[in-house]
Swiss-Prot record:
Transmembrane segments: none annotated. It comes from the Eukaryota. This is Tetratricopeptide repeat protein 7B. The keyword Cell membrane applies. Disulfide bonds: none annotated.
């Protein structure tokens, strides 16, 4: 009785070791079994043959497409064991079947494919049961199907008939699909058994659970079917097979395989499938698909059934993607979480190979995520994903650079610059990286000292190529030009303007065919009021790029500086025919129309701008009259559309480039406006600020036109619309001061100008109007102080010089007053309708 119990325990242990592929333990267990049960000699031969074959394959792994091994001493020994077990015929039928399947596997390893197929035919592989069998037998059957598929692929077809070729291909794929399905079932079963054993184990510690390995045959069964589908041009079935594998309940052994398959399917969905040819995972595949090779016809559904299948994920609340990008994104986010979980980060030499594989796998996932999220404009999410990739990014330029670009696209400029610094360290010879950093610094960040350093780096790196050196000088010129605009001392402004001019001249000489170099040289000359020279260079820029909006705009402003207002307006109209939604051009058009065609046309343009603004940002009621309150109630700013529209990036309508003072002022305005809005319970602004700033500017331009024709009521209504958006904007407060002046209420006007200057202390127009009121009140010293400060801020404002002359004259300083009047006359003669600085200075 004790012997029977011992035998039963041994048999259970042997079955467990076979299921868990612990082949090194089998010989010792067989010895114990033979000593206790003499009748098990044939079983011992089977077990020894199987364990020695598996040990050989572990030591000499097979590779797809490798040549056959032929007879080897170890394999000869395997054959002896299996032949002995089969020849005596004492085994039960199921063990005889196992012996035959293992013998067929041995024949494949030795290259005897025909004999292997003969054995499968004799055994009746398709009739072997899958229910009520131990897990190891599922593995044996799965490997048998995979081996049969491999043998069929290796053997040539006797006839050249195309139908036979198609039938053979389908037989091969069916073998692999069955192998894969049964392999998944086996892996689920063995994991269930292992977990059950762990839970039922007594407190006494036992052997640690053995990590399963797929091995060559199971891996082939799981991966070969979809490869053949794609090779044969049947993308529909290939995608279907991927989905079947991914829907199966995951096991520890299939985790890496699932990550690979998820990544491959995502790549196919992104690169090889459009929205029209997509079908979701719960739908039946289309009978005919443009994805498939039209010359190869076949069913897009399974041609076989199995008596038992692997468990799949199911339930009421499972998410099902509805389009290809959505499914790809889901797959990639799953892959990313798996890549992060299994990351190999150790820097010790022994782990180098594993670390490189881990990095390569993660990099592919993040590259595909960049494609998927980039298509949808989800740069915020992309930057968050790539931030998680930083654990892999030590000394890896590609991931750092991708992260920097995603931060740029997401509008996180400050962080992007810091990441770009690391990219420069990793790749110091690449001039494009400091050029990008300079672009960010001179943009919304307005870090001009940093921008100057990056621009000088570009110049130094670009010594080998004149193209990058020219770009470096262009960036340097823009930095100096912006610094000159910021400078509070007139002498410093002139020094920086000269440096900017020299840098632009150097850029133009290095790259005479670059329209940007010619354009910015012309713009800098215009800012310095060298109008004839500027005209020459802007014409060069237009010869190089005839449809450049900024060059056309500059030409129009230069013509207006020469008082050719009609010609300037014609140029603006020409530019607007190419760029009808460019608001900066439209603002200039309003000013020019006021000067040469009268206020009616200018007001029509303002109305037209409101209509464009509505159409750009999806008004739900396009027939709306355009009143500001109703605009606020019904406007929806679509983030995707904002990137395709030209919007002014400024808070002051007189300047298109960002200034240090205007950056600070706009932040103060925004904070105060939010407080004021909350107190007034006005409608909240949806989406980014730029569209709302543009809308406010439209209303302010309309108000300015009404002030010009002496209509304070209409001007007040327009200003109120802007105030609904930004109650504490210095431009709104300035316009209220203008309206108060028009009504003759000087004390009120003075209060508005003082409030505007409290928010933006360098707003020249408010300074000039406040000084004029102080002059009228007889406060000459304070008026002079304010006007001298205004001259320091903007030395080309002729109205300020004229006001300063009047104040000095009133104080009896006629000589200084005369000099101021002459300066004002000289500047007015070259003054454009709109300041040249309205044109953005960006890379």
């Amino acid at each position: 009785m004790a012997t029977k119990k011992a035998g039963s325990r041994l048999e259970t242990e042997i079955e467990r070791c076979r299921s868990e592929c612990q082949w090194e333990r089998i010989p010792e267990l067989v010895k114990q079994l033979s000593a206790k049960l003499i009748a098990n000699d044939d079983m011992a031969e089977l077990l020894l043959g199987e364990s020695k074959l598996e040990q050989y394959l572990k030591e000499h792994p097979l590779r797809q497409g490798a040549s056959p091994r032929g007879p080897k001493p170890q394999l000869t020994e395997v054959r002896k064991h299996l032949t002995a077990a089969l020849d005596r015929g004492n085994l039960k039928s199921e063990f005889l079947q196992e012996s035959n399947l293992i013998m067929a596997k041995l024949n494949y390893v030795e290259g005897d494919y025909k004999e292997a197929l003969n054995i499968y035919a004799r055994v009746g592989l398709d009739d072997l049961p899958l229910t009520a069998v131990p897990p190891y037998r599922l593995r044996v059957i799965a490997e048998a199907y995979a081996t049969k598929g491999l043998c069929l692929e290796k053997l040539p077809i006797s006839s050249s008939t195309s139908n036979l070729h198609v039938d053979r291909e389908q037989d091969v794929i069916t073998c692999y699909e069955k192998a894969g399905d049964i392999a998944l079932l086996y892996l689920q079963e063995i994991e269930r058994v292992i977990l059950s054993n762990i839970q039922n184990r007594s407190p006494k510690p036992g052997p640690a659970p053995h990590d399963q390995e797929l091995g060559f045959f199971l891996e082939t069964g799981l991966q070969r079917a979809h490869v053949l589908y794609f090779k044969n041009g049947n993308l529909t079935r290939g995608v279907g097979r991927f989905r079947e594998l991914l829907r199966a309940v995951e096991t520890r052994t299939t985790q890496n395989l699932r990550m690979t398959i998820a990544r491959q399917l995502a790549e196919i969905l992104l690169r090889g499938m459009c929205e029209q040819s997509y079908w979701n995972p719960l739908e039946d595949p289309p009978c005919q698909s443009p994805l498939d090779d039209p010359l190869r016809k076949g069913a897009n559904t399974k041609t076989y059934t199995l008596t038992r299948r692997a468990r799949v994920y199911s339930g009421e609340n499972i998410f099902c993607p509805q389009e290809n990008t959505e499914e790809a994104l889901l797959l990639l986010l799953i892959s990313e979480s798996m890549a992060n979980r299994d990351a190999v980060l150790s820097r010790i030499p022994e782990h180098k190979s594993d670390r490189l594989i881990s990095l390569q796998s993660a990099s592919v996932v993040y590259d595909l995520l960049t494609i998927a999220l980039g298509r949808r404009g989800q740069y915020e999410m992309l930057s968050e994903c790539l931030e998680r990739a930083m654990k892999f990014a030590f000394e890896e330029f590609h991931l750092w650079y991708q992260f920097a670009l995603s931060l740029m696209a997401a509008g996180k400029s400050a962080r992007a610059v810091k990441v770009l610094k690391e990219c420069i360290r990793l790749k110091p010879d690449d001039a494009t990286i400091p050029l990008l950093a300079a672009k960010l610094c001179m943009g919304s960040l307005h870090w001009l000292e940093e921008a100057e350093k990056f621009a000088k780096t570009v110049v130094d790196v670009g010594e080998k190529t004149s193209e990058f050196k020219a770009k470096g000088y262009l960036a340097l010129g823009l930095t100096y030009s912006l610094q000159a605009t910021d400078a509070s001392l007139r002498g410093m402004q002139e020094v920086l303007q000269r440096k900017a001019l020299l840098a632009f001249q150097r850029a133009h000489s290095l790259s005479p065919t670059d329209h940007q170099a010619a354009f910015y040289l012309a713009l800098q000359l215009a800012i310095s009021r060298q109008i004839p020279e500027a005209l020459g260079y802007v014409r060069q820029a237009l010869q190089l790029q005839g449809d450049d909006a900024n060059s056309l705009h500059l030409l129009a402003l230069l013509l207006s500086a020469q008082k050719h207002y009609h010609d300037a307006l014609n140029i603006i109209d020409m530019a607007l025919s190419e760029y009808p939604e460019n608001f900066i051009l439209l603002f200039s058009k309003v000013k020019l129309q006021s000067l040469c065609r009268g206020p009616d046309e200018a007001l029509l343009t303002c109305k037209h701008m409101l209509q464009i603004w509505k159409s750009c940002y999806n008004l739900t009621n396009p027939s709306d009259s355009g009143r500001g309150s109703s605009l606020l109630d019904r406007t929806i700013a679509d983030r995707r559309q904002l990137n395709t529209i030209t919007l002014p990036d400024f808070s002051d309508p007189e300047t298109g480039s960002v200034h240090a003072t205007s950056v600070a002022a706009s932040r103060v305005e925004q904070a105060l406006s939010e407080v004021a809005s909350s107190l007034q319970s006005s409608a909240p602004k949806q989406g980014p600020l730029h569209p709302w700033m543009t809308l406010a500017q439209i209303w302010l331009h309309a108000a300015e036109v009404y002030i010009g024709i002496g209509k304070p009521a209409e001007a007040t209504a327009c200003t109120q619309e802007a105030a609904n958006l930004f109650p504490m904007s210095h431009n709104v407060l300035y316009m209220r001061g203008q309206i108060a002046e028009l009504r003759g209420s000087m004390d009120e006007a003075r209060r508005w100008y003082e409030e505007a200057l409290a928010i933006s202390p360098t707003h020249v127009k408010s300074m000039q109007r406040l000084a004029l009121i102080l002059h009228q009140l007889g406060r000459y010293s304070l008026a002079e102080k304010i006007l001298r400060d205004a001259v320091q801020v903007n030395s080309t404002a002729h109205e300020v010089w004229n006001g300063l002359g009047e104040v000095l004259q009133a104080q009896g300083n006629d000589a200084a007053a005369t000099e101021c009047f002459l300066t004002a006359l000289e500047l007015e003669a070259s003054s454009p309708a709109v300041p040249f600085t309205i044109i953005p200075r960006v890379l």
